[in-house]
């Protein structure tokens, strides 16, 4: 069967159907079990990070190397011609597109990744995060981790906690889980950082249950997944940040009464919203979650760059 993701831009999780998501997750599981060190041996991939990143950039570049690809790019957009000389993003991408087989890009401006697709010369663009908008590859590793720990992606009770306004990971994850039946969402956030109305409207239109809460402890006994997020300091003014940064903090004691299968996830970096005593509980799974980024991103790269992928 032809691979539906071959040469496809991956900008939003909505670019992927449920069937596409399931294909990526099957491929990720296969690559985790059976490494393919020469799968992308003759490919060159650009890693273009116009915004700071640790886990996403390193896991993407590790994924590229472990599949045998050559990697070019930069980790700081301020040192490029765009940053130093005022070149437009359109011109930068137009040139990079002539050098490589795929472009992985992070940019602080919402919509930048979608814009890049118009100037890449048909070279596929993979969004590694654009402002507060979308982070589809984080969602793929989140889905992979949920499936790995729960054995399913349907009938999941998931709480999302913290900065639900600017946290692009929760926007993408809510949209992805809405493609699977029976999932229920519990949203816990300061009023100023509540889940955007368009996400709530999407859930309502699909008939998906959600509820708003003011504490973590009140919902813990009902949860399969507790998804913590940090407050996005870089997107708030200092006074706003001071008011909300410590409003929701998870401590080990808060997990009393949790189901045995509960896993605590976090896209990282963690600041102080999960205390270190949680790390020692059987519920903590955020470091393993980060490790799964390798396999989810390998799967996406493999599918986008291979017309007929059979693993």
From Swiss-Prot:
Cellular component, GO annotation: cytosol
First-level EC class: transferase
GO molecular function: amino acid binding; aspartate carbamoyltransferase activity
Keyword Transferase: yes
TM ranges: none
Coiled-coil residue windows: none
PROSITE patterns, A to Z: CARBAMOYLTRANSFERASE
Biological process, per Gene Ontology: 'de novo' pyrimidine nucleobase biosynthetic process; 'de novo' UMP biosynthetic process; amino acid metabolic process
Keywords recorded for this protein, A-Z: Pyrimidine biosynthesis, Transferase
Record-listed E.C. numbers: 2.1.3.2
InterPro entries xrefs: Asp/Orn_carbamoyltranf_P-bd (IPR006132), Asp/Orn_carbamoylTrfase (IPR006130), Asp/Orn_carbamoylTrfase_sf (IPR036901), Asp_carbamoyltransf (IPR002082), Asp_carbamoyltransf_Asp/Orn-bd (IPR006131)
Pathway noted in the entry: Pyrimidine metabolism; UMP biosynthesis via de novo pathway; (S)-dihydroorotate from bicarbonate: step 2/3
Protein purpose: Catalyzes the condensation of carbamoyl phosphate and aspartate to form carbamoyl aspartate and inorganic phosphate, the committed step in the de novo pyrimidine nucleotide biosynthesis pathway.
The protein's name in its UniProt record: Aspartate carbamoyltransferase catalytic subunit
Species this chain originates from: Serratia proteamaculans (strain 568)
Lineage, uppermost ranks: Bacteria, Pseudomonadati, Pseudomonadota, Gammaproteobacteria, Enterobacterales
């Amino acid at each position: 069967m032809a691979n539906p993701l071959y040469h496809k831009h991956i900008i939003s999780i909505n670019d992927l159907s449920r069937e596409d998501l399931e294909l990526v997750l099957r491929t990720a599981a296969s690559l985790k079990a059976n490494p393919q060190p020469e799968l992308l041996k003759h490919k060159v991939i650009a890693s273009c990070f116009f915004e700071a990143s640790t886990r996403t950039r390193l896991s993407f570049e590790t994924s590229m190397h472990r599949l045998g690809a050559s990697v070019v790019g930069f980790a700081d957009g301020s040192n490029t011609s765009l940053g130093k000389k005022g070149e437009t993003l359109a011109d930068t991408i137009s040139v990079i597109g002539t050098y490589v087989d795929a472009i992985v890009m992070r940019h602080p401006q919402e919509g930048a990744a979608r814009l890049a697709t118009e100037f890449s010369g048909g070279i596929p663009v993979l969004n590694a995060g654009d402002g507060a908008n979308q982070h589809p590859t984080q969602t793929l590793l989140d889905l992979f981790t949920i499936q790995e720990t729960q054995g399913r992606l349907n009938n999941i009770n998931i709480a999302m906690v913290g900065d639900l306004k600017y946290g692009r990971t929760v926007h993408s994850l809510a949209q992805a889980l809405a493609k699977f039946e029976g999932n229920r969402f519990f949203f816990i956030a300061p009023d100023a950082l509540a889940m955007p109305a368009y996400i709530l409207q999407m859930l309502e239109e699909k008939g998906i249950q959600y509820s708003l809460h003011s504490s973590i402890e009140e919902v813990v006994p009902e949860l399969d997944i507790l998804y913590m997020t940090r407050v996005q300091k870089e997107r708030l003014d200092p006074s706003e940040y001071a008011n909300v940064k410590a409003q929701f903090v998870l401590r080990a004691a808060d997990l009393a009464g949790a189901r045995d299968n509960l896993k605590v996830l976090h896209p990282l970096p963690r600041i102080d919203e999960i205390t270190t005593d949680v790390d020692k509980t059987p519920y903590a799974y955020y470091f393993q979650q980060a490790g799964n980024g390798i396999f989810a991103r390998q799967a996406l790269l493999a599918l986008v760059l291979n017309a007929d992928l059979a693993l």
